[in-house]
From Swiss-Prot:
One of its GO terms (molecular function) is metal ion binding. One of its GO terms (cellular component) is membrane. Pathway: Glycolipid biosynthesis; lipid IV(A) biosynthesis; lipid IV(A) from (3R)-3-hydroxytetradecanoyl-[acyl-carrier-protein] and UDP-N-acetyl-alpha-D-glucosamine: step 2/6. The active site is at 259 (proton donor). GO terms for biological process: lipid A biosynthetic process. This is UDP-3-O-acyl-N-acetylglucosamine deacetylase. It catalyses: a UDP-3-O-[(3R)-3-hydroxyacyl]-N-acetyl-alpha-D-glucosamine + H2O = a UDP-3-O-[(3R)-3-hydroxyacyl]-alpha-D-glucosamine + acetate.
Amino acid sequence: MYQTTIKKSVELVGIGLHKGSAVKLRLEPLESNSGLIFYRSDVDVAIPLLPANVVDTKMATVIGKDGYVISTIEHMLSAIYAYGIDNLKIIVNADEVPVMDGSSASFCMLLDEAGVVQLDVPKKIMRIKKEIIVQEGEKYVKLSPSTDLKYGFTIKFPHPVIQQQEYVLNFTKQNYKDEIARARTFGFLHEVQYLRSKGLALGGSLENAIVLDDKKVLNPEGLRFDDEFVRHKILDAIGDMALIGMNFVGNYEALAGSHDLNHKLTLELLKDAENYEVIELVDEKTKELEKAYA
């Protein structure tokens, strides 16, 4: 199996979650060993996708360089990871990726339009060799060795609609599209009101998020899945783990995980080369892994 990029450039326009302004997103092919590179066309700044370039994880994953940032990258990255794309230029003309409907479904459709093409250099993946855990009180995120890739997530909210939800994704591209991609981000009405008072979440609406008051979901169409909340947490986790820089084989597990804990997990993983092994997908032993991205 070889490294990939997209067949042709594609673009879309959507609303930025925090500023509420229109943002154009454009994806362009890159050659082998380029990696994923974000580019802000409004200020002519390129920001490679690296854990060291993460500058904020409070409400979204934010990367930055030389004082310029790009926010809310995790939904876009989640789709890119699920499609197994290794090399891509991601261009925005503002300081955030458009939120679209709050899921990664629009980005999956954009990648379907672009198409995926193999290049001339073997694809590299990371095999997790040791268990790595980052814990804060009851909350934790963990990676452990496995022969495949699973994402398991548990959330607990003192809300009658959410309560405790658990989900395990046996990762393949198709399973991701069927089970995860349409799950939307969510928030509580009192949080949205507070953020807007601070000049944030100006683009947030029932069109791009699940919003809950103290008792119910306010979106008139309801939920896409009964457990849409935990499914979206897996969507976020996949996007955050893309900061590793390549697809990996191992189990991801989280209890009340967050962007911040996911970032700390990638740093903990990468700080010791004994934690992982980078392998090239070049022989019969890797055929099963290829099926995941078919």
